[in-house]
């Protein structure tokens, strides 16, 4: 039987605001998954080495807590949500995004644009509930064209390993009923809304995309899944998490972006960073 790893405590309140120039950025927690730490989590490092790094930071070694934190950007009258969490599909410790948005004063009905970094379930499942209804009914949903092309490609789905078929089905189910008036694809590097530019960071998935928010000469980088939990992967950028589809491309872009945000002293936010997920 699986060991009882306990349940992570969800922070309260589940949102954190910061101002940058004329922009307000709010991290809004969807939940935290506690997963047993096994050999497979870091694909290219022995478990003993992974555990030693956790121990050196005073962190537990039998499990890993993976938070899910979408971000809201309020700029120029726009209310933009970046990624959506697991919604009703993530068990009792997830699906808190809608209540935390309300608590932060930005109910789902106020969101006019949803930006999606990539199509893994913890980023897109919050778009709909189990009945299939849209959580952000008034919003345009903007997705990377390269990501959309990959997951909607029947040949890619047919060739995918068995463990990946479900992700293809999930992506298709999530986006299938969205018409062209709602679902918008954007090219790599496009300015998706005024003041927010997309940054291609392919590797974790074939169309994995970051977003850079600029205001008054300052920048905030939403790093999506460039690095999973930073206690492991920010300290060892060459380590590959089990979820990286192209580990070498992910490693390369991780090092490039880390160098960029370090030299520019940008504020960063990471979907799987410890809450409040700013860095």
Q: Model segments located where?
A:
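Active-site metal-binding loops of divalent metal-dependent hydrolases
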Residues: 30-31, 84-87, 119, 146-147, ...
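Active-site glycine- and acidic-residue-rich loops that bind
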Residues: 197-211
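Metal-dependent catalytic neighborhoods of phosphoester/phosphodiester hydrolases
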Residues: 96-99, 125-135
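Cap/insert and terminal regions of metallo-dependent hydrolase folds
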Residues: 214-279
């Amino acid at each position: 039987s699986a060991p009882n790893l306990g349940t992570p405590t969800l922070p309260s309140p589940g949102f954190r605001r910061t101002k940058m120039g004329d922009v307000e950025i709010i991290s809004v927690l969807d939940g935290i998954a506690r997963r047993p730490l096994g050999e497979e989590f870091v694909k290219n490092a022995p478990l003993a080495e992974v555990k030693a790094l956790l121990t050196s930071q005073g962190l537990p070694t039998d499990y890993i807590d993976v938070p899910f934190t979408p971000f809201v950007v309020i700029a120029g009258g726009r209310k933009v949500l970046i990624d959506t969490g697991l919604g009703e599909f993530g068990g009792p410790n997830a699906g808190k995004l809608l209540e935390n948005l309300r608590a932060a004063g930005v109910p789902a009905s106020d969101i006019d644009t949803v930006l999606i970094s990539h199509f893994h379930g913890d980023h897109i499942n919050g778009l709909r509930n189990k009945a299939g209804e849209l959580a952000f009914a008034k919003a345009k949903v903007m997705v990377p064209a390269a990501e959309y092309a990959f997951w909607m490609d029947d040949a890619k789905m047919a060739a995918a390993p068995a463990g990946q078929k479900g992700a293809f089905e999930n992506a298709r189910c999530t986006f299938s009923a969205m018409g062209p008036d709602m679902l918008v694809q954007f090219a790599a590097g496009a300015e998706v809304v005024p003041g927010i530019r997309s940054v291609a960071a392919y590797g974790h998935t074939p169309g994995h995309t970051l977003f850079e928010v600029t205001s008054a000469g300052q920048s905030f980088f939403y790093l999506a899944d460039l690095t999973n939990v930073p206690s492991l992967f920010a300290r060892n950028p060459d380590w590959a998490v089990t979820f990286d589809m192209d580990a070498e491309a992910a490693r390369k872009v991780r090092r490039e972006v880390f160098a960029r945000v370090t030299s520019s002293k940008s504020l960063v936010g990471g979907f799987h960073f410890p809450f409040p997920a700013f860095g």
